[in-house]
């Protein structure tokens, strides 16, 4: 079967794609393994392309901008032209980003090769201007970061596993699950 014939649009980032996001206007925002971030409109026209410090791990967007984790950094870009609005280094690898109620949340993690495991993780909160409001450290690595009904949830790995609910003020409440497995994927419609 030739899948190319079934495609309505084909665009190249000129590097392997590491993250993909479709915004509310059906624009496609793609990030690559070498740090390129590009935005196409719903018709497939390239609107802009920029270079970030490292591999793009996660992308989020709202009416105020586009947010991406790239290597050790969280970056905020102008949605219209891709201009960098602000950028912050996080502790360890910048992993996941999302926006909820006018705030930008990101997770980071530190991996120790000797222990062959994650030794520290954090959830960060920034306002839209890029000011850090708070950071909370935890021993579990957050594998997912999702909003549901105005609440922010983390899917957790070892040692506690399960789910954590995070308030806008930074309170983290662990919720155990029946399973003793890490929560590494989620679906939010």
Each predicted region: which residue ranges?
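A short helix->beta-strand "capping" segment at the edge of beta-propeller domains
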Residues: 1-15
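A structural motif specific to WD40 beta-propellers
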Residues: 8, 45-49, 83-86, 133-134, ...
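Repeated scaffold domains used in trafficking and secretory/extracellular systems
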Residues: 15-21, 54-63, 91-101, 138-149, ...
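Acidic/polar residues in short coil/turn loops that connect beta-strands
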Residues: 23-25, 34, 43, 62-64, ...
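Conserved beta-strand element within WD40/beta-propeller blades
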Residues: 29-31, 67-69, 106-107, 154-156
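WD40 beta-propeller blade core
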Residues: 38, 75-76, 124, 162-164
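Short loop/turn segments that connect beta-strands within beta-propeller blades
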Residues: 41-45, 78-82, 126-131, 167-170
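Short, solvent-exposed loop/turn segments at conserved positions within beta-propeller repeat blades
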Residues: 68-69, 113-120, 157-161
């Amino acid at each position: 079967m030739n899948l190319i014939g079934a495609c309505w649009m084909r665009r190249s980032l000129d590097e392997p794609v590491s993250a993909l996001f479709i915004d509310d206007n059906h624009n496609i925002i793609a990030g690559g393994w070498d740090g390129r971030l590009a935005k196409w409109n719903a018709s497939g026209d390239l609107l802009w392309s920029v270079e970030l410090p490292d591999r793009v791990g996660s992308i989020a967007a709202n009416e105020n901008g586009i947010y991406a984790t790239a290597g050790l950094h969280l970056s905020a870009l102008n949605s219209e032209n891709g201009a960098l609005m602000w950028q912050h280094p996080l502790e360890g690898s910048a992993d996941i980003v999302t926006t909820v109620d006018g705030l930008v949340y990101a997770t980071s993690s530190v991996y120790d090769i000797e222990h062959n495991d994650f030794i520290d993780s954090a959830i960060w909160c920034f306002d839209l201007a890029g000011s850090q409001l708070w950071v909370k450290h935890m021993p579990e690595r957050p594998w997912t970061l999702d909003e549901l009904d105005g609440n922010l949830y983390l899917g957790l790995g070892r040692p506690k596993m399960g789910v954590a609910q995070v308030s806008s003020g930074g309170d983290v409440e662990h919720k155990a699950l029946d399973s003793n497995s890490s929560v590494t994927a989620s679906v939010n419609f």
